């Protein structure tokens, strides 16, 4: 009996499999799956509702309609199991076989499979080397194709029209064979000898010169090799037999009223069967060719529609005009099999309800309505009731629960105790969107949620709903408690800062309790303990904000964790003393002895977590919340109209601005300024007026003057409610207060341009109709934007998750020695991100030395925690090599050392952590906060971009980075290199600021000189680009002929004349070939050379250059020979926000990218063509020169004869990530993408750790292009996973063979997701048909390595707790121990089962 149960359990388990292979099915294979041929299009008999014989629902083919009962009713009950009824031919078995038994249709004429024909690139076309158009013409009977040319002049695969065919017949008779339709294509495919083709193409490849032809041949070779290695035969792409889906997967359901609801597939199959039968009959009758042809074409079309409706021609529609859903539609898209049923399922033991606040809960609790709990925990309750003997059977227990007997509630309490439940709020944007809590039973119907977890869920209580899920098994409960409990998720995985931070009311209450007030009641009292201070407050002797002296007791935790108490007297307020009571032992009182805003509270919690650990922090957070709520109530802060104080200065400031605007308007009308300038100036005037008003308002609001107890006036922070809310960070911001009490300011039109008349009123004064109308513009656009943003952000997250889903920590240390070098991020002079924030939680890649010595400060493989970062700061280290995911050497995963600290836990990351998904969520989750718009640069912004000097902010020492310079006659330095940077170093050697300085900058100080804050140290002209001479001498004009290559112009204002070089297009034919230049000679007229080389000092002048010198003039080093006017670069729109992030991760090439030098060498210009310049770079080592054609309108940064390094910018523009990777390497491209993405997020004040972006970049760099195949089996130009090549190369090197050489390639995230090795993952992402077609042709197998594939096949994922499970299975496999089934034969089991059932039957 036990054996039987074991056997039945065993039946549920499928055999273990290690992968899934996809391939083409041969006609014989399809027949072997089938249980019979479907010959008739009938479905079921409409009177008896029984399936028709040999029809689409035939019981004989597919199995019985009722369990263990044949169709005619001769055999019923289990004992006849396996009998085939002789009357109706139905096997007596379970009805569920109708879900798995397939049928088939023998097609009267072969039919091409539309996926292999039409999904691009067409596989059949590639195989036959014919165009898709031609093949379609053959298939749809429009022309003939030659199959066997025989002894004629025709060629195999040649297309013949009807006339050509008849002509050929007359000429050659039956020497040759030509056909049309799928038979023709079938014959052509059959005739291909794969081995021979491969040999031929391999021989042919090296000799091909044309790039396109080579690409085509490689593609074809890869396809044919795929067929050859996978054992697929090309003719299987043409169907001779069509499989029929099991009927229960395309059900026909009777509705009431005699109608039927049916799956579209039945209609499509019926069409195919009808046409197939008609074709058979026509062939039997030997009908005229044209009729048969038409029928064959129709059969082809109906099969196309069944497989992929709408891919060719118009989609076949049903009775209600909508296209029928074909087999391809069943699996693709959001509603398809993959995304609807395999990746996301509905689960039982779940419920949902509205949420409300639970301010009395502890952090690990949630309030669960009794009704819900009763329903969710039913099986547990039944079990308990039965176990206690309160109910004899499950049925009785059920009745008790339905009647809600008193005992049931006691049992429920017991069941629920310590049984965590999971709460989830949609949309689940990151892993904190599902957390576990211990339920507390409550009355009512709403779930109660702890206020501190709202931030993680992004929940509010305006009607949000949440879902509850019950973990059933012990393991599930354990995981929920250990990993998902809200108390274990205090830090955000995105940036490692606390996410359980009080907000709103709580912040306001804590801020209120910690404020001080001048001359408050009880000021200057002294208390011997905190308790005494509190007593004084409770009896009313002192108020909360009074400044007093209190003796406090602090616990100090020493180095070794020993605790010592110490007492001291502090100046504080009563409120802060009371607040210090909840401070956990071990934290200093100074942390609360300040105004507690949101930032301070967050820091306090962070410090608490780092110093005292999880438990204390959780308790403390709860206490903070209770205290905050209590004192927020006591504070009575509320918003009244009198709190919005309008500054008196407002009206005069507005009047001044209006006067200025009128003045500009007058200038415009008299033609002194252009329309554009006028608009920009007006907007600037109003923007600055708005700033001034809001400044005056904030000064007015934020402080008040009071009389202190010595009778003197003293300023103190104001207790204005609105100001307190904003200052504490509880709600609102200066910008919002400005609209309430300042002026509303400038508004934008929906297209993003600014309306030049601002709204001068504020909300307290009220808006008039026009002002209100202008406001609605922006407000409505905001709403529309939000809707778009949500969708876009969600799609970005989906792509990120898809590309990174298979990255898991799989080993401890890969031993990689290289890493990324981290420096503080400095932008335009400010330190945006100090070094400690960038390296915190990373592992050191190379020993960090004490600056200036060779003594090791932090050895390799140190995990830099807070203490180490403090050390680095003390010793002013300004660059650290840290290990990074990008340089990790692990194949198919990442090692813990390269990843560093797990941000959500604060220690080094665990094995099996799914870092890819965490990274994707961290980047995607704040997506909705990013803006959607592209910024038009106008007004203030565009002038800021035309900087012309560097003003230092900090005192320090001047240092130049990769700069070449010459000293001019005034003794100043002139920069003559391109990408130079200037940095200010403080006395500790730390870099404080850094600026880019262009070519031609004049420096007022020498390198290494001391500079003071506010000093201007560098100047340049932003509107022209000078040509600086590096030698002194006299100038000689070359090819500068007036009227041919140059013209003279006289400046109207100054009367000075200057020479302007004509552009090539403007010159006469005589001047086209001339190259105007300035040559430098000494006093004797001999050519001078550029110092250190034998290159003559000759400077070629580009078109439009202006020369202010005359022939033979004397000049000195560092003077400008000529100036090239720079058109103020067209105000480009900078793509901001979400679209910019998407562009970076998709690695899109910008429209007009910067042009970078492909090789290092010397620049020269070759012969020009119409509209283009020829740029030639001659390498210094005398290799082949590199040529590139550059459009004339691009501003070049280089002159003839200048030396450039590989990857240097030649023409400005946005840099393309692909170019950076190719020319400057992986480290640079990684830095570029990380910094660009971070810029967008930083602008919105969102913190994301660099690690997460690096994880995505690793996935973007996962493929490479083979440049030299060596002895490997890769093809040149093939795209392969880097890990694959590395593994292959290791084997080759071990065998002493030539390894393959490769070049890394950067793929956008969509491309990278579709290019994964796992076809299941790729198919469930996008372009399902294309992915599956490609996989089938190549006979790919999926090893189920990633997370997504395992979810789809219904296994534990190989990450987290499933990581060990997969590891153990791999071990068991390696040692060959497969799980053995118990020794019981099927017949024994049947016998046992029959006995059992008969026993049960006799008892009834």
From Swiss-Prot:
Binding site for Zn(2+) 1: 70, 72, 85, 88
CDD domains linked to this entry: RNAP_beta'_C (cd02655), RNAP_beta'_N (cd01609)
Pfam families in UniProt: RNA_pol_Rpb1_1, RNA_pol_Rpb1_2, RNA_pol_Rpb1_3, RNA_pol_Rpb1_4, RNA_pol_Rpb1_5
Catalytic reaction equation(s): RNA(n) + a ribonucleoside 5'-triphosphate = RNA(n+1) + diphosphate
EC supergroup of this enzyme: transferase
InterPro entries: DNA-dir_RpoC_beta_prime, DNA-dir_RpoC_beta_prime_bact, RNA_pol_asu, RNA_pol_N, RNA_pol_Rpb1_1, RNA_pol_Rpb1_3, RNA_pol_Rpb1_3_sf, RNA_pol_Rpb1_4
UniProt binding sites for Zn(2+) 2: 814, 888, 895, 898
Enzyme Commission numbers on file: 2.7.7.6
Cofactor descriptive note: Binds 1 Mg(2+) ion per subunit. Binds 2 Zn(2+) ions per subunit.
Requisite cofactors: Mg(2+); Zn(2+)
SMART domains the record matches: RPOLA_N (SM00663)
Keywords from the named record: DNA-directed RNA polymerase, Magnesium, Metal-binding, Nucleotidyltransferase, Transcription, Transferase, Zinc
Keyword Nucleotidyltransferase included in the entry's annotation: yes
Gene Ontology BP annotations: DNA-templated transcription
SUPFAM superfamilies for this protein: beta and beta-prime subunits of DNA dependent RNA-polymerase
GO CC annotations on file: DNA-directed RNA polymerase complex
UniProt GO molecular function: DNA binding; DNA-directed RNA polymerase activity; magnesium ion binding; zinc ion binding
Protein residues bound to Mg(2+): 460, 462, 464
PANTHER family in the record: DNA-DIRECTED RNA POLYMERASE, DNA-DIRECTED RNA POLYMERASE SUBUNIT BETA
Similarity comment text for this entry: Belongs to the RNA polymerase beta' chain family.
Record's subunit section: The RNAP catalytic core consists of 2 alpha, 1 beta, 1 beta' and 1 omega subunit. When a sigma factor is associated with the core the holoenzyme is formed, which can initiate transcription.
Task of the protein: DNA-dependent RNA polymerase catalyzes the transcription of DNA into RNA using the four ribonucleoside triphosphates as substrates.
UniProt-recorded name of the protein: DNA-directed RNA polymerase subunit beta'
Gene from which the chain derives: rpoC
């Amino acid at each position: 009996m036990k054996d039987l149960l074991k056997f039945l359990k065993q039946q549920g388990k499928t055999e273990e499999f290690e992968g899934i292979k996809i391939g083409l099915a041969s006609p014989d294979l399809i027949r072997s799956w089938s249980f019979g041929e479907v010959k008739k299009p009938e479905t079921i008999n409409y009177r008896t509702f029984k399936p028709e014989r040999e029809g689409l629902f035939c019981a004989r083919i597919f199995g019985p309609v009722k369990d263990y009962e044949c169709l005619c009713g001769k055999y019923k009950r289990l004992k006849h199991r396996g009998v085939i009824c002789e009357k109706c031919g139905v096997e007596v078995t379970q009805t569920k076989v109708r879900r798995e038994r397939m049928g088939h249709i023998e097609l009267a004429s072969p039919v091409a499979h539309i996926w292999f024909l039409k999904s691009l690139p067409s596989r059949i076309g590639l195989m036959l080397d014919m165009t898709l158009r031609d093949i379609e013409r053959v298939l749809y009977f429009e022309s003939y194709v030659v199959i066997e040319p025989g002894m004629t002049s025709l060629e195999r695969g040649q297309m013949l029209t009807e006339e050509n065919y008849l002509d050929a017949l007359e000429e050659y008779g039956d020497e040759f064979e030509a056909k049309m339709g799928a038979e023709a294509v079938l014959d052509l495919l059959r005739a291909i000898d794969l081995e021979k083709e491969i040999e031929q193409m391999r021989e042919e490849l090296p000799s091909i010169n044309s790039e396109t032809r080579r690409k085509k041949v490689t593609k074809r070779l890869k396809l044919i090799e795929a067929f050859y290695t996978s054992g697929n035969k090309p003719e299987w792409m043409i169907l001779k037999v069509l499989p029929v889906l099991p009927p229960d997967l395309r059900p026909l359901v009777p509705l009431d009223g005699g109608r039927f609801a049916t799956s579209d597939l039945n209609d499509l199959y019926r069409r195919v069967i009808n046409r197939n039968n008609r074709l058979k009959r026509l062939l039997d009758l030997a009908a005229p060719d044209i009729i048969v042809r038409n029928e064959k074409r129709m059969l082809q079309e109906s099969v196309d529609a069944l497989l992929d409706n709408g891919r060719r021609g118009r989609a076949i529609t049903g009775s209600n005009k909508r296209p029928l859903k074909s087999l391809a539609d069943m699996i693709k898209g959001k509603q398809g099999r993959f995304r609807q049923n395999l990746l996301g399922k509905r689960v039982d033991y779940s419920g949902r309800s509205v949420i409300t606040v639970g301010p009395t809960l502890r952090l690990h609790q949630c309030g669960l309505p009794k009704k819900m709990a009763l329903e969710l925990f039913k099986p547990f309750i039944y079990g308990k009731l039965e176990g206690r003997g309160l109910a004899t059977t499950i049925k009785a227990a059920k009745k008790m629960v339905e009647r809600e007997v008193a005992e049931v509630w006691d049992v429920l309490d017991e069941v629920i105790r310590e049984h965590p439940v999971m709460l989830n709020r949609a949309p689940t944007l990151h892993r904190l969107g599902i957390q576990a809590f211990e339920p507390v039973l409550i009355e009512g119907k709403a779930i109660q949620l702890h206020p501190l977890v709202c931030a993680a869920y992004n929940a509010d209580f305006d009607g949000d709903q949440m879902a509850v899920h019950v973990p059933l098994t012990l393991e599930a409960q354990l995981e929920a408690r250990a990993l998902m409990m809200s108390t274990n998720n205090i830090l955000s995985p995105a940036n490692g800062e606390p996410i359980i931070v009080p907000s709103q009311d709580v912040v306001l209450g804590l801020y209120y309790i910690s404020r001080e007030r001048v001359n408050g009641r009880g000021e200057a009292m002294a208390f011997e303990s905190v308790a005494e201070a509190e007593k004084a407050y409770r009896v009313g002797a002192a108020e909360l904000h009074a400044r007093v002296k209190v003796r406090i007791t602090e616990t100090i935790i020493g180095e070794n964790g020993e605790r010592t108490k110490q007492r001291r007297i502090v100046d504080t307020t009563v409120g802060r003393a009371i607040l210090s009571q909840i401070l956990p032992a071990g934290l200093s009182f100074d942390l609360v002895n300040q105004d507690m805003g949101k930032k301070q509270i967050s820091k306090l919690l962070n410090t608490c977590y780092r110093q005292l650990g999880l438990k204390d922090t959780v308790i403390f957070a709860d206490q903070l919340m209770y205290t905050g709520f209590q004192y927020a109530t006591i504070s009575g802060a509320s918003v009244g109209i009198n709190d919005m104080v309008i500054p008196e200065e407002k009206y005069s400031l507005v009047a001044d601005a209006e006067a200025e605007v009128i003045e500009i308007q007058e200038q415009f009308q008299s033609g002194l300024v252009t329309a554009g300038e006028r608009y920009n100036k007006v907007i600037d005037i109003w923007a600055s007026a708005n700033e001034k008003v809001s400044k005056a308002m904030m000064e007015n609001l934020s402080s008040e003057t009071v009389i202190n107890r010595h009778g003197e006036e003293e300023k103190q922070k104001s207790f204005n409610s609105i100001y307190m809310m904003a200052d504490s960070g509880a709600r609102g911001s200066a910008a919002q207060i400005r609209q309430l009490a300042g002026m509303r300011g400038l508004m934008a039109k929906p297209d993003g341009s600014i309306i030049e008349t601002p709204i001068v009123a504020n909300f307290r004064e009220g808006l008039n109709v026009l002002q209100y109308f202008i406001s609605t513009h922006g407000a409505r656009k905001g709403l529309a934007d939000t809707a778009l943003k949500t969708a876009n952000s969600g799609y970005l997250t989906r792509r990120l998750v898809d590309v990174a889903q298979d990255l898991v920590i799989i080993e401890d240390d890969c031993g990689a020695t290289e890493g990324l070098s981290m420096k503080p991020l400095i932008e335009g002079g400010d330190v945006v991100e100090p070094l400690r924030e960038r390296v915190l939680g990373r592992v050191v890649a190379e020993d960090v030395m004490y600056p200036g010595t060779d003594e090791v400060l932090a050895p390799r493989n140190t995990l830099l925690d807070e203490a180490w970062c403090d050390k680095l700061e003390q010793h002013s280290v300004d660059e650290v090599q840290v290990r990074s995911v990008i340089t990790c050497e692990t194949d198919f995963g990442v090692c813990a050392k390269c990843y560093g600290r797990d941000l959500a836990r604060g220690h080094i990351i665990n094995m099996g952590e799914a870092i890819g998904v965490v990274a994707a969520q961290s980047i995607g989750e704040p997506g909705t906060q990013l803006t959607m718009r592209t910024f038009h640069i106008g007004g203030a912004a565009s002038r800021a971009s035309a900087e012309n000097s560097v003003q230092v902010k900090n005192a320090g020492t001047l240092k130049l980075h990769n700069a070449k310079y010459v000293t001019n006659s005034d003794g100043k330095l002139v920069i003559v290199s391109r990408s130079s940077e200037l940095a200010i170093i403080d006395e500790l050697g730390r870099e404080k600021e850094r600026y880019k300085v262009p070519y031609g900058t004049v420096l007022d100080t020498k390198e290494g000189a001391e500079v003071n804050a506010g000093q201007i140290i560098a100047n340049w002209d932003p509107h022209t680009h000078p040509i600086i001479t590096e030698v002194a001498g006299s100038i000689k004009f070359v090819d500068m002929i007036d009227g041919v290559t140059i013209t003279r112009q006289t400046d109207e204002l100054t009367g000075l004349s200057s020479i302007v070089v004509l552009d090539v297009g403007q010159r006469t034919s005589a001047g086209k070939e001339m190259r105007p230049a300035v040559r430098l000679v000494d006093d004797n007229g001999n050519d001078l050379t550029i110092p250190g080389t034998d290159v003559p000092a000759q400077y070629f002048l580009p078109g439009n250059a202006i020369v202010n010198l005359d022939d033979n003039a004397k000049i000195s080093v560092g003077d400008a020979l000529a100036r090239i006017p720079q058109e103020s670069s067209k105000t480009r729109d900078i793509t901001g926000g979400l679209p910019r992030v998407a562009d970076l991760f998709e690695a899109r090439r910008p429209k007009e990218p910067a042009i970078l030098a492909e090789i290092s060498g010397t620049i020269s210009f070759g012969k020009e063509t119409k509209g283009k310049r020829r740029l030639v770079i001659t390498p210094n080592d005398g290799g082949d020169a590199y040529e590139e054609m550059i459009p004339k309108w691009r501003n070049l940064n280089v002159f003839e004869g200048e030396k450039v390094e590989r990857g240097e910018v030649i023409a400005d523009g946005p840099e393309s990530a692909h170019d950076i990777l190719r020319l400057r390497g992986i480290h640079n491209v990684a830095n570029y993408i990380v910094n660009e993405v971070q810029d967008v997020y930083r602008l919105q004040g969102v913190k994301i750790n660099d690690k997460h972006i690096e994880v995505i970049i690793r996935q973007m760099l996962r493929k490479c292009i083979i440049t030299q195949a060596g002895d490997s089996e890769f093809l040149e130009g093939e795209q392969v996973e880097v890990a694959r090549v590395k593994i292959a190369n290791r084997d080759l090197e071990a065998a002493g063979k030539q390894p393959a050489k490769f070049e890394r390639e950067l793929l956008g995230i969509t491309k990278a997701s579709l290019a994964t090795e796992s076809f299941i993952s790729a198919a469930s992402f996008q372009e399902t048909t294309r992915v599956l077609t490609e996989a089938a042709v190549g006979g790919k197998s999926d090893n189920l390595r990633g997370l997504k594939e395992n979810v789809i096949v219904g296994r534990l994922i190989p990450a987290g707790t499933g990581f060990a499970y997969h590891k153990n299975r791999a071990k068991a496999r390696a040692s060959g121990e497969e799980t053995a089934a118990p020794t019981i034969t099927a017949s024994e089991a049947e016998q046992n089962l029959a006995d059992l059932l008969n026993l049960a039957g006799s008892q009834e």
